[in-house]
């Protein structure tokens, strides 16, 4: 099959999907989603804030025209259009793709999108759910038969490698209030204990000195360990392989297992994750990692497992064994069998 993949640019997941499809013997080309607010100029963003809404409308119409033209240039007899999230797909684009199979892989809950997006789901040939509970919702609301397909880890980046684990606790991700609160407490603990910690991600805009000052004032302990920049998967995996404990602090929106969970396990690293996620038949939350209830429980478990390297290794090895079936290659194979 020949895939025309349309998806977002964040975290290299689209790139991983395209590469995997090519490795599996298919051909795949990529057309990136370009949301207005994330890609426009500083001036356009300011004008939009002041009420020039037509800027966004023109941006999106131009993108839609380019997407249709890209499809026309690359479509052939055995073409499948594969939409990753589908956030910028419109009825006009789907009209232009009529006659070809159109597949949607969600990377978020469909309930976080507006009703027009949800109704459009019925136009896809196949729809794969990121949130397990979306399947029942789609069946009830739209008589739509979705299939569950988690977002897998990229095995070219996330794999085990023997090396010194010189970082006691690590976290890689974006700033959320619950993460800030938890990580400030963990940083205070690590500092007092004389350990080492690494937190990576863009947590404030360092082009403005006052934002850096404000962050340091609010989170003095965390600032000491913060690598304030976005890092690629290879660098993320390197941090995991150097860490005794990697924290997985999920947001309150998602309940299904996140790709970050798989990525940590794939490096054969011990993982501490907050309670609230559900396995839905993926990994075993009782043996592949350790869950914590709240901040106090997390600090107790960090203290305990830093002193128990053998137990960490046993749990990490079990998690690594169980996560093998959730690599990007295995999950793309599952998708291909369904379509």
Task: Outline where the language-model segments fall.
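Glycine-centered loop/turn motifs
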Residues: 76, 285-287
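Conserved acidic donor-binding segment of nucleotide-sugar-dependent glycosyltransferases
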Residues: 289-295, 304-310
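A charged, aromatic-enriched C-terminal amphipathic alpha-helix characteristic of glycosyltransferases
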Residues: 307-337
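Active-site proximal beta-strand in glycosyltransferases
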Residues: 82-85, 95-110, 128
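Short amphipathic alpha-helix with an adjacent loop that forms part of the alpha/beta core around
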Residues: 70-74, 305
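Nucleotide-sugar donor-binding catalytic core of glycosyltransferases
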Residues: 1-49, 59-69, 84-88, 118-262, ...
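Short acidic/histidine-rich motifs immediately flanking catalytic phosphotransfer sites
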Residues: 74-80, 243-244
């Amino acid at each position: 099959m020949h895939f025309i993949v349309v998806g977002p640019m964040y975290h290299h997941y689209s790139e991983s999907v395209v590469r995997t499809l090519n490795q599996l013997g298919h051909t795949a080309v990529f057309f990136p989603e370009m949301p207005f607010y994330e890609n426009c100029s500083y001036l356009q963003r300011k004008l939009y804030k002041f009420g020039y809404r037509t800027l966004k409308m023109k941006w999106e119409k131009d993108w839609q025209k380019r997407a249709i033209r890209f499809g026309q240039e690359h479509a052939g007899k055995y073409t499948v259009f594969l939409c990753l999230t589908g956030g910028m797909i419109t009825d006009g684009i789907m009209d232009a793709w009529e006659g070809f199979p159109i597949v949607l892989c969600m990377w978020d809950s469909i309930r976080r999108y507006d009703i027009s997006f949800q109704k459009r789901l019925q136009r896809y040939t196949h729809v794969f759910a990121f949130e397990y509970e979306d399947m029942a919702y789609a069946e009830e609301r739209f008589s739509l038969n979705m299939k569950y397909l988690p977002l897998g880890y990229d095995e070219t980046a996330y794999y085990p490698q023997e090396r010194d684990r010189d970082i006691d606790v690590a976290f890689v991700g974006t700033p959320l209030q619950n993460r800030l609160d938890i990580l400030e407490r963990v940083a205070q603990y690590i500092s007092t204990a004389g350990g080492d910690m690494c937190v990576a991600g863009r947590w404030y805009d360092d082009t403005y000195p006052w934002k850096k000052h404000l962050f340091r004032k609010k989170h003095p302990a965390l600032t000491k360990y913060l690598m304030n920049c976005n890092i690629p998967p290879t660098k993320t995996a390197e941090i995991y392989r150097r860490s005794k404990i990697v924290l997985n602090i999920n947001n309150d929106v998602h309940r299904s297992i996140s790709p970050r969970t798989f990525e940590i396990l794939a490096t054969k690293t011990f993982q501490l994750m907050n309670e609230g996620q559900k396995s839905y038949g993926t990994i075993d939350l009782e043996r592949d990692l350790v869950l914590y209830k709240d901040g106090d429980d997390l600090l107790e478990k960090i203290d305990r497992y830093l002193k128990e390297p053998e137990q960490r290794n046993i749990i990490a090895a079990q998690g690594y064994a169980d996560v093998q079936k959730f690599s990007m290659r295995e999950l793309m194979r599952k998708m291909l069998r369904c379509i």
